[in-house]
Amino acid sequence: MAVAPNALATWANAITAGRLVLSPIMFLVIPDHTRGSWIAFGLWFLLCLSDGIDGWLARKHGTTSSGAFLDPLADKVLVLGAMFTLVARDVFWLVPVAIIAGREVVISVYRTLVASKGVSIPASQTAKLKTLFQQLCVGFALWPWFADDRALWNTMLWIAVVLALVSGAQYLWWSRITSRALADAGVA
C-alpha cells in the first residue's frame, strides 16, 4: 500500500528513526582495541541491514519527504560516528575519515540547497557503492575474524575515499547542469 509523500509515520521512517536512536549505543560498544568485538560487529550488521530494509520498504510503499531527509541523515550519523569513534580508538587513521566527512558535508549542503528549490537529487550508484564500502570497512574492523587484517579494511576505507571523491565530483558536475536547468526554468 502506497503512503502519502508527506507521511511521517511509516515503517521505513520507524526503522530509520531506530537506526538514529541506536547509533550512539553503537559508538559506545566499539572496543578500544583492534581485536574486534562480536557485540559491536553484530549491532553494526543489524544497523546496516536496517538501512537496506528501510530502503526496500520506501521503494515498495513510496518515499516520503521526511524519509528522504531522515534516511541520509541516519546513514551519515551511523557511518561517520562509527568512523570517528574508530579514529578516537586509534583503529582508523584520521585523514581518510576526514576526507569522507568533508565530502559528506559539502554534498549534504549542496543537496539541501537544491532541495530548497524543489529539486530532489537521488543518491547515485557511485554514492551507494561508497556507502557500501564505508559500511564494509567499519564492519571488517569490528569483526573479530578480520579485525587484525588492517590491510583488508584499510583498503576498503581508501576505496570508500575514492568513491566519495568520485561521487562528490559527479554531484558537483550535475549541479552545473541542474543550475542551468533551474535558471532556464526561472527557478534559480
Model region roles, listed by residue range:
Residues 1-13, 20-23, 39-48, 118-188:
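C-terminal membrane-associated helical module and adjoining short loops/tails
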Residues 5-9, 17, 99-102, 106:
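Membrane-embedded alpha-helical bundles of polytopic integral membrane proteins
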Residues 16, 21-66, 82-98, 152-165:
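Membrane-embedded alpha-helical segments that form the functional core of polytopic membrane enzymes
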Residues 18-26, 72-85, 107, 130-141:
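Core segments of transmembrane alpha-helices
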Residues 21, 49-57, 73, 77, ...:
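Active-site His/Glu-centered metal-binding helix of metallohydrolases
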Residues 30-34, 88-90, 103, 115, ...:
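Short helix-capping/hinge motifs at transmembrane helix termini and TM-loop junctions
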Residues 56-60, 113, 176:
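Membrane-interface helix caps of multi-pass small-molecule transporters
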Residues 66-117:
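Helix-adjacent hinge/juxtasegments
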